[in-house]
């Protein structure tokens, strides 16, 4: 039951983008096409899951036992950067079109505050290894879900007549706000778990 609660809260109630406002740059930058959003969601899911596992093990196995918690942020950033490089190499070989579409946003996963934020939150919440992995995967799914829904709406907005003053970023921000309000409808459900 604890894990179900973590999943529901991470995906819907405390969605990392729509409630905690982490990862806004890729959320706005890669959300013009659904295909790109799916690719970015998959890349973030992979990096976030592996980064959380590695950073958790480093924190509990090296940093805490040796009193090196002050190296937490730099260690986590190095782990994330290494994983992003690995994803970039794999995507370049496996799916060159997706690699081209993601463009500059793929290396930006390194500085995506979602990845670092989740790695730090897992430590702050004092989750176990299993709970931290459930939280990481759920957070990544929540990010991908919000990104895919938002990109679907933006594709539809591209086909409609939007007043000139509202085209581009203004209508995207208004849409993101409405989407965030829709996700607020899930607040309170976390009390069940």
Roles of regions detected by a PLM:
Residues 6-43:
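Juxtamembrane transmembrane-helix termini in multi-pass membrane transport proteins
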Residues 155-173:
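Interfacial loop-to-transmembrane junctions
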Residues 3-18, 67-82, 133-146:
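Structural signature of hydrophobic alpha-helical transmembrane segments
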Residues 2, 181-193:
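Juxtamembrane boundary at the C-terminal end of a transmembrane helix
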Residues 22-36, 84-98, 150-161:
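C-terminal ends of transmembrane helices
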Residues 60-103:
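Ordered, amphipathic secondary-structure segments that act as subunit-interaction surfaces
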Residues 21-29, 88-93, 104-106, 113-126:
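Generic transmembrane alpha-helix signature in multi-pass membrane proteins
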Residues 43-53, 103-118, 168-180:
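Small-residue-rich segments of transmembrane alpha-helices in multi-pass membrane proteins
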């Amino acid at each position: 039951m604890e894990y179900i609660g973590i999943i529901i809260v991470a995906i819907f109630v405390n969605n990392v983008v729509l409630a905690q406002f982490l990862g806004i740059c890729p959320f706005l930058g890669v959300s013009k096409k659904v295909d790109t959003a799916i690719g970015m969601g998959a890349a973030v899911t992979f990096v976030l899951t592996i980064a959380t596992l590695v950073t958790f093990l480093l924190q509990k196995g090296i940093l805490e036992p040796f009193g090196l918690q002050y190296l937490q942020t730099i260690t986590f950033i190095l782990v994330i950067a290494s994983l992003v490089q690995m994803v970039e190499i794999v995507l370049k070989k496996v799916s060159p079109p997706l690699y081209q579409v993601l463009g500059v946003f793929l290396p930006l996963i390194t500085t995506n505050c979602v990845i670092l934020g989740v790695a730090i939150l897992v430590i702050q919440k004092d989750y176990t290894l299993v709970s931290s992995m459930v939280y990481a995967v759920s957070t990544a799914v929540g990010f991908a879900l919000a990104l895919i829904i938002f990109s679907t709406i933006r594709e539809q907005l591209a086909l409609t007549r939007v007043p000139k003053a509202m085209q581009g970023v203004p209508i995207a921000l208004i849409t993101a706000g409405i989407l965030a309000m829709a996700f607020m409808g899930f607040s309170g459900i976390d009390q069940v778990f």
